[in-house]
Amino acid sequence: GHFGGRRELMSLETARQAVEFLIAASKHRRHCEIDFFGGEPLLNWEVVKETVAYAREREKETGKEFRFTITTNGIGLTREIMDFINDNMYNVVLSIDGRKEVNDRMRRTVSGKGSTYDLIVPKYQEMRRLRGDKSYYVRGTFTAYNLDFAADVAHLNDLGFDQISVEPVVTQAGEPYALSEEHLSKILAEYEQLAQLYLERRERGRGFNFFHFNVELKKGPCLYKRLSGCGAGFEYLAVSPAGDLYPCHQFVGQDEFKVGTVWDGLINSQLSASFKESHVLSKQVCRGCWAKYYCSGGCHANNLFHAGSFTEPYQLTCAMEKKRLECAFFIQARAASD
C-alpha cells in the first residue's frame, strides 16, 4: 500500500529478512509477534502466507514462538483466506468505521464508486461466525465527521459483533477530519453515552466488549509496561515494504524517524533510546497525573503531530483518556454493585 509513502508491495525476501531481524533483535525472548498491516495485506496475500510458513520453520530451528495478527479492510476476504487466518492467526482486526454513511465517507473504493460497507459487512459477519471463540475485533476510527460515535458502536453491535474498538483519529492537525479542542465537550459526552449503552446492552443480554473500557484494576501489565505503553521504537517496530524500520506505522516514510533496516539492524540507536526514555516519569506533565499508569503517556505520533514533540503529551488525547478511564471505572463499579 501507500501508507506513509509510495504504493508498493513487500517482497518475500524482505519479509523473510524481517523475520530474521526479529529473531536476532528479540535475543533471549521466546515469544514474538508479527502484525500484517498496511496499506492492505490481502493485496500481498501470497507473501503473507509464505512469511507465516517461513516463521513456522524458524520456530523449530530457534525455539521461538511466533504469534500472528492481521489487520484488513475486508474487501479481498474470501472463504479460503478466512480459513487460513482462522488456522494461523492469533487475532484478526476487521476495519470498519460503523454506520454505512460514516464508513463510506472515509473508506472508499479505488474507483470511488460503490459502497465498501456493502462489500465488507457480509464478509465480516461470516468471519465472525467462522472465528468461533478465537480472538477478533472490529476496529473503527471516529473523526470530526462522526462525533456521535456511540451510534457507530451500537450499529456494529447490531450487526452481530461483540468485540469492538472505535479509536480517535490520529492525523495532522490541518486535516478537515482532524479532532480539535472545539470537539472535546462533545467527545467526552459521547463516551458517557457509550458507557450507558454498554450497560444497557449488557443488561439486555446483548453485551459487547469495548476496547477502551477493558481496564484491569487488580492485575494488568507490570510497572515497566505501564511506564511506556506500546513500546514503539524499542519493543515494537514497523517495517516498510522496502525493509526500512520505523518506531511505528504512523512514522513510516518520515526519514528523520527511520531507525534502521531489516538487513542492517538498528542504526539510529539514539532515536530508539529516546523513545524508550520517553515514559510517564520523564514527562513533567504526566508525573502528577492520576491516569499515568493507564495511558502510559499517550500515543507518540499524536503527541508529535499536535504538541510538536513525541515527549510532550497532547492535551486533547489526555482528556479523552481520562474520560474513558472514568467510564471504565463506572462500569466496573456498577458490575460490583450488581
Predicted regions and their residues:
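Canonical Radical SAM [4Fe-4S] cluster-binding loop centered on the CxxxCxxC motif
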Residues: 1-12
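Radical SAM/AdoMet-radical enzyme domain recognition
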Residues: 12-35, 44-169
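Cysteine-centered iron-sulfur cluster-binding motifs in ferredoxin-type domains/subunits
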Residues: 40-43, 233, 286, 292-294
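Radical SAM enzyme [4Fe-4S]-AdoMet core and its adjacent flexible, acidic
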Residues: 101-121, 125, 129-236, 240, ...
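Flexible mid-to-C-terminal extensions adjoining Fe-S/redox cofactors in radical SAM and related proteins
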Residues: 252-338
